[in-house]
């Protein structure tokens, strides 16, 4: 497979959206403690996360080895967190089961109402890519609305990006090695299910 495969910067996967009502999932998540995502492009507790599947048993174990000065040991194994057995998570398993691949980290990422994530890339995670065994990052909005805007830029030199509004229950590939930003102009916290998927041809076929 050619290394420099031409791929979109954002694409809705060729999967039927998850249409059952998942508002109960959002309400359940709103009551949980989230952990701050430490970055240079957000402030305070604006951007937070919890882990559903990762490198520790606790939902606040959101990091992986060798990323963001993580204290996670390199020998740490992937595992489900304590959210695994919660009844509210049943729709999440149904959503994830539609993705034809193995998963690395699976997190819920929250952007508070009225807050922004500044322009950045996710290149700090060296595993992200498109070839077999690399990480393809898939976003599935769980709680959002039309006033949440995701902006992607083709090049670091671009001053103006393309704006997207991602819909609840839809599956989106985002090339997070490209500059991107998010602004939540609504009065509701935005929560995305973010699945880091091990790339394979079947998954790529849903994107290309």
Model-derived segments and their meaning:
Residues 118-122, 129, 149-154, 185, ...:
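A short secondary-structure junction signal
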């Amino acid at each position: 497979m050619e290394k420099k495969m031409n791929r979109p910067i954002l694409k809705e996967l060729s999967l039927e959206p998850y249409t059952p009502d998942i508002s109960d999932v959002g309400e359940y998540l709103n009551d949980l403690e989230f952990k701050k995502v430490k970055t240079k492009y957000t402030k305070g507790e604006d951007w937070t996360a919890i882990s559903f599947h990762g490198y520790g048993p606790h939902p606040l174990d959101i990091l992986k080895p060798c990323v963001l000065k993580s204290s996670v040991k390199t020998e740490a194994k992937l595992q489900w967190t304590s959210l695994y057995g919660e009844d509210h998570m049943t729709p999440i398993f149904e959503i994830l089961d539609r993705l034809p691949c193995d998963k690395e980290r699976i997190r819920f990422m929250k952007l508070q109402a009225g807050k922004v994530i500044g322009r950045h890339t996710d290149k700090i995670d060296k595993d992200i890519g498109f070839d077999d065994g690399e990480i393809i990052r898939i976003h599935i909005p769980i709680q959002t609305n039309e006033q949440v805007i995701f902006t992607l830029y083709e090049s670091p030199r671009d001053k103006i990006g393309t704006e997207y509004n991602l819909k609840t229950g839809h599956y989106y590939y985002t090339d997070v090695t490209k500059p991107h930003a998010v602004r939540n102009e609504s009065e509701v916290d935005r929560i995305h299910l973010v699945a880091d998927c091990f790339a394979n041809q079947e998954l790529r076929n849903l994107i290309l």
